[in-house]
């Protein structure tokens, strides 16, 4: 797992959350929670001895990453995030999902 991809995505999420217009706190919270859940599930998966337990948490992390992508899609459609920011986020998520898929 590349920590650079994960940390870059978390930094981007922080930027997006800080820049969303007033009235979109729910969208911000949902994206932040899903992104942080990716990190927590990867950490929890790494802490288990059995492959089955680890895999379960990596699958959850992958699902949370997909939720982040869906959140970015909605924000882009609603014109709440710049195209460049959206594309950067999707690119990071594609890398993250690919890495998690290999771990499953």
How should each PLM-predicted stretch be described?
Residues 1-104:
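Amphipathic alpha-helical assembly/interaction segments
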